[in-house]
UniProtKB/Swiss-Prot annotation:
Pfam families: TIM
Localization annotation: Cytoplasm
Protein name per Swiss-Prot or TrEMBL: Triosephosphate isomerase
GO cellular component: cytosol
BP GO annotations: gluconeogenesis; glyceraldehyde-3-phosphate biosynthetic process; glycerol catabolic process; glycolytic process
Keyword list, A-Z: Cytoplasm, Gluconeogenesis, Glycolysis, Isomerase
GO MF: triose-phosphate isomerase activity
Main location: cytoplasm
Pathway(s) annotated for this protein in UniProt: Carbohydrate biosynthesis; gluconeogenesis; Carbohydrate degradation; glycolysis; D-glyceraldehyde 3-phosphate from glycerone phosphate: step 1/1
Reactions mediated catalytically: D-glyceraldehyde 3-phosphate = dihydroxyacetone phosphate
Source domain of life: Bacteria
Function: Involved in the gluconeogenesis. Catalyzes stereospecifically the conversion of dihydroxyacetone phosphate (DHAP) to D-glyceraldehyde-3-phosphate (G3P).
Length: 252
């Protein structure tokens, strides 16, 4: 089963619209062929319309970093998935460990968001990952498996097959520590095996599983060599055009 590699940058809460536009203009014409690899960037809500306009006609996909699960209503400060679709958003990141930790998002919240994203014709990038404590206790597979099952509950097999699931060990995010190649492969296979158990092997063979956690141009190729790693969700190394483009060099 051939799955197209996907390198997705996550700017987190960085860049104003002017800086965001300059970034897209610097990378848009230099991206590899969309037949070889999918390139995307998850940007702050205030940058979305600017980035979508600047990326038009290029191979760059645009992701929101979060959404609410209702399309409209009295939800002050939230972002409508319906409006995200209307402005041209391709993907939505949900369940990032920073959202789970700082904003107390639950597996149930993330599942509702996944359903809302699909209902509005976009694709979720569903994040999962364990703490250092869970990892050292030898419970990473059990913990991450439960997160994945909960996030996908009630979705159709077709929806799950088109989903992107990003495994990010919390202890490796922004710390400079990264999981070994063996750890990344083992845990991305855990994710795929959970999908197979819940939705069947055919669906599991289609879902794209990304690794995230201190991925850099220097180590991306070793992760991409793993059979169950289909791409990367990248934080700090996606902030500069040169570094972002270098992440895509593994396809050469």
């Amino acid at each position: 089963m051939s799955r197209k590699p996907f390198i997705a940058g996550n700017w987190k809460m960085n860049k104003n619209p002017e800086e965001a536009k300059a970034f897209v203009e610097a990378v848009a014409s230099k991206l590899p062929s969309a037949d070889l690899v999918e390139a995307g960037i998850a940007v702050p809500a205030v940058d979305l319309t600017t980035v979508i306009a600047a990326a038009k006609g290029s191979n760059l996909k645009v992701a929101a970093q979060n959404t609410y699960f209702e399309n409209s209503g009295a939800f002050t400060g939230e972002t409508s998935p319906q409006v995200l679709k209307e402005i041209g958003t391709d993907y939505v990141v949900i369940g990032h460990s920073e959202r789970r930790d700082y904003f107390h998002e639950t597996d149930e919240d993330i599942n509702k968001k996944a359903k809302a994203i699909f209902a509005n014709g976009m694709i979720p990038i569903i994040c999962c990952g364990e703490s250092l404590e869970t990892y050292e206790a030898g419970k990473a597979a059990e913990f991450v498996g439960a997160q994945v099952s909960a996030a996908l509950a009630g979705l159709t097999p077709e929806q799950v097959a088109s989903s992107v699931i990003a495994y990010e060990p919390i202890w490796a995010i922004g710390t400079g520590k990264s999981a070994s190649q063996d750890d990344a492969q083992k845990m991305c296979k855990v994710v795929r095996d959970v999908v197979a158990a819940d939705f069947g092997q055919e669906v599991a063979d289609k879902v794209r599983v990304l690794y995230g956690g201190s991925v850099k141009p220097e180590n991306v190729a070793e992760y991409m060599a793993c059979p169950d790693v289909d791409g990367a969700l990248v934080g700090g190394a996606s902030l500069e055009p040169e570094s972002f483009l270098a992440l895509l060099d593994f396809v050469k």
